[in-house]
Amino acid sequence: MVKVKKLFKTYGGKPVLKELDFEVEEGERVYILAPNGFGKTTFLKVLANIEPFQKGEIEVFGIKSPSHKIRVMISYISERDNLYPGFRIIDILRFISGFWEIDRSKFENFLFLLKINPLKRYSEFSKGERTLIRVALGLSIKAKIYLIDEPLSSLDFVLREKVVKLLGEMGGGTFILTSHEIDELLPFANRFVFLKDGKFFLETRDREKVKDIYREVFA
């Protein structure tokens, strides 16, 4: 489904991803773990065809990157607050619908669960609420793969639980998530990989070992 071979990527002249290999099968929920600044966001942006790469190969459903066909297969949910502050939520939905197919009933259900008024402007919501809106929008895209960058970062306990609830509503699907900490999404994932020195250093499917491995790898 996703195959990455010998991926090399520089950022600001500095190597960030170095001869990185990675594969994901359909239905996997992969959690990429590493401290901040280790290349997690860069890797997701390269996969999503947002950032270019210098060397290596990326293939998604048999299509080689870069390709617009890959971009529309993927829903990339950024940690950055990158939506349009003056737009109402319903207007943002209409805009995004011009690029991706949206499951409107799913989005409406998410807004109901979150108690978000779609007629309010994006700028009227708190920082944490805006994160919830971005996650809800991204998960409402009819994508083959969901790339979610640090979905719980800077959220309080109540909002973290809401993100977990949204993901729980998804049922099936293929997900690649990132985090710099072991958090509430640990039960959601079924595969855990550790990014260090520009490569995936180690991986496990055993949730019980994740905290110990993280401490060992990044001590």
What are these regions (language model features)?
Residues 2, 17-19:
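Conserved structural motif at the start of ABC-family nucleotide-binding domains
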Residues 33-35:
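The feature captures the beta-strand-to-loop junction immediately N-terminal to the Walker
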Residues 48:
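Helix-to-loop junction immediately C-terminal to a conserved catalytic motif
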Residues 55-70:
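Conserved ABC transporter NBD signature motif
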Residues 107-125:
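Conserved ABC nucleotide-binding domain
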Residues 146-150:
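Catalytic Walker B motif of ABC-type/P-loop ATPase nucleotide-binding domains
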Residues 178-180:
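H-loop/switch region of ABC-family ATPase nucleotide-binding domains
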Residues 199-219:
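Conserved beta-strand-loop-alpha-helix hinge in the C-terminal portion
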